[in-house]
């Protein structure tokens, strides 16, 4: 199975979700000066920022990570977290990334996610990779 790449702000909600998920994952650094590069296809798990619009929905660190053509080329899908208080903007970062990068939006969960979210994502990620061609 290929990897997960995620970003978690200082609130650590996404980090806690990843820990509970128990799947191999690489974190995009919080410090904007630090860079990572991936070498295999991955699913991105990203929190949504802002209060409603598309501007500012995707964290700057994630934008910088995806602006690296090598990293962007290996992206296969996106999962977003958010807050239902933002209504239609709930999980908007996932929508923005899926549209701009031409990958499927796979799942959306609130804040740290529920046990049901953990189970759904674990199962969904496994099934997603099983459906992918070997060299995708």
From Swiss-Prot:
Record SUPFAM superfamilies: Flavoproteins
Induction: Induced 2-fold by hydroxyurea.
Pfam families (UniProt xref): Flavodoxin_NdrI
Superkingdom of this protein's organism: Bacteria
Molecular function via GO: FMN binding
Gene Ontology BP term (one): protein modification process
NCBIfam families given in the database record: nrdI
Its biological purpose: Probably involved in ribonucleotide reductase function.
Similarity section: Belongs to the NrdI family.
The name this protein goes by in its record: Protein NrdI
Organism per entry: Escherichia coli (strain K12)
């Amino acid at each position: 199975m290929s990897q997960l790449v995620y970003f978690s702000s200082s609130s650590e909600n996404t980090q806690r979700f990843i820990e509970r998920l128990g799947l191999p994952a690489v974190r995009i650094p919080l410090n904007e000066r630090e860079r990572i590069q991936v070498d295999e296809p991955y699913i991105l798990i990203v929190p949504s920022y802002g209060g409603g619009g598309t501007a500012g929905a995707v964290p700057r660190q994630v934008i910088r990570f995806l602006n690296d053509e090598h990293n962007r080329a290996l992206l296969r899908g996106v999962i977003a977290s958010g807050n239902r208080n933002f209504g239609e903007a709930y999980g908007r970062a996932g929508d923005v990334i899926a549209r701009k990068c031409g990958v499927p939006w796979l799942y959306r969960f609130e804040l740290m996610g529920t046990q049901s979210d953990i189970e759904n994502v674990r199962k969904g990620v496994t099934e997603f990779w099983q459906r992918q061609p070997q060299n995708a």
